[in-house]
């Protein structure tokens, strides 16, 4: 059995093949704004799979994928078999990506656990001591800080967030990078400390997403950086639902 795992985020949509036991080397990516049946036919021409599992946070793309996929397919939701309970008053509000992260984290790192996913938004998702999804925190992503300043000021430029050489910037770009990276690490540390205090127990902390490695370098409380936690959550969910 070969699965096609589809992780549709706001910025990019990933397509990864897997067996029931592990991810396979074949990986494809399409910018989310470009996803269409025609584009997928082009990028994934010749890709063979038996069934697909999807986590999508973009309704337009979800519809495109429903029309494009002809094999058995499961869209991850709170109604899926997850191997993780849901202790949340409005489960249909939970993003499919957050559910996939919870599934992957519980399987690979145990529980309690916090998954920090650095994307367009940063999400903190909490899996409690009883292996239940409890909720979490949503904040603007790292890139959003620089984008906001560029859009709403006359003279500040766009920046590419990267490790500052020092805190005291000696140019506008250096000062913005320092504010973004060090400020963001402060945000992450504060939220993690408060989550741990509310849980009353020390959880494993797993970081994933595009900015995970950069931010984790300065946040000792992050135990693991795992770029594939969402995909492995999808792989596990495929085995439970297909």
Swiss-Prot record:
User: InterPro entries of this UniProt entry?
Assistant: ATPase_NBD, Type_III_PanK
Keywords carried by this UniProt record: ATP-binding, Coenzyme A biosynthesis, Cytoplasm, Kinase, Metal-binding, Nucleotide-binding, Potassium, Transferase
Does Metal-binding appear among the keywords?
Answer: yes
Q: Where in the cell is it found?
A: Cytoplasm
Assigned EC number:
2.7.1.33
Molecular functions per Gene Ontology: ATP binding; metal ion binding; pantothenate kinase activity
Q: How does it assemble?
A: Homodimer.
Check the record and name the PANTHER family matching this protein.
Answer: TYPE III PANTOTHENATE KINASE
Q: Give the protein's function.
A: Catalyzes the phosphorylation of pantothenate (Pan), the first step in CoA biosynthesis.
- Family of the protein in this entry: Belongs to the type III pantothenate kinase family.
Which protein, by its recorded name, is this? Answer: Type III pantothenate kinase
Q: Which gene encodes it?
A: coaX
């Amino acid at each position: 059995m070969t699965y096609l795992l589809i992780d549709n985020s706001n910025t990019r949509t990933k397509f990864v093949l897997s067996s029931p036991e592990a991810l396979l080397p074949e990986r494809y990516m399409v910018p989310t704004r470009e996803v269409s049946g025609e584009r997928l036919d082009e990028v994934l021409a010749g890709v063979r799979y038996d069934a697909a599992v999807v986590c999508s946070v973009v309704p337009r793309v979800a519809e495109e994928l429903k029309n494009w996929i002809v094999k058995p397919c499961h869209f991850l939701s709170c109604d899926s078999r997850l191997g993780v309970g849901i202790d949340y008053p409005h489960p249909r509000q939970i993003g499919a990506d957050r559910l996939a992260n919870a599934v992957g984290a519980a399987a690979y790192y145990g529980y309690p656990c916090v998954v920090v996913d650095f994307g367009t938004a940063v999400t903190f998702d909490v899996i409690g001591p009883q292996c239940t999804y409890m909720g979490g925190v949503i904040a603007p992503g790292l890139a959003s800080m620089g984008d906001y300043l560029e859009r709403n000021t006359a003279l500040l430029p766009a920046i590419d967030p990267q490790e500052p050489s020092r805190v005291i910037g000696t140019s506008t770009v250096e000062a913005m990078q320092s504010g973004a990276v060090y400020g963001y690490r402060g945000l992450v540390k504060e939220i993690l400390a408060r989550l741990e205090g509310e849980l009353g127990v020390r959880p494993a902390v797993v970081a994933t997403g595009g900015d995970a490695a950069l931010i984790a370098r300065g946040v000792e409380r992050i135990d693991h950086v795992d770029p594939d936690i969402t995909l492995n959550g999808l792989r596990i969910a495929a085995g439970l639902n297909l």
